């Protein structure tokens, strides 16, 4: 409901990096000719079996067909790794110019890294996750 209120005109581009319930919430909001670049499915990285419930593939395929949605997977390192230096230069400049904003969740101590990583896979954070192993002194 909140997503539908936030996107009253629907969704034209959905960058898929999570999958699962997030994708389920976005699917009915996709507009005709929407585009979905798929870079990851973090919600299912630890899955050892199919999720419970009905098979949702027919709904996905019907939606892709009826709305003429373009769905394309890509792996950044393989597809764009050759442009890493260009990216670092441009992104670094944009961050300096305050054109790019991001959230950081900092956890102190290497001993907390395993639990923080598990939380990342379960969607318990928002933004960039950092493990601080030493102070800034």
What are the residue ranges of the model-derived segments?
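Terminal helix/beta-alpha structural elements that buttress the NAD(P)+-binding lobe
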Residues: 1-137
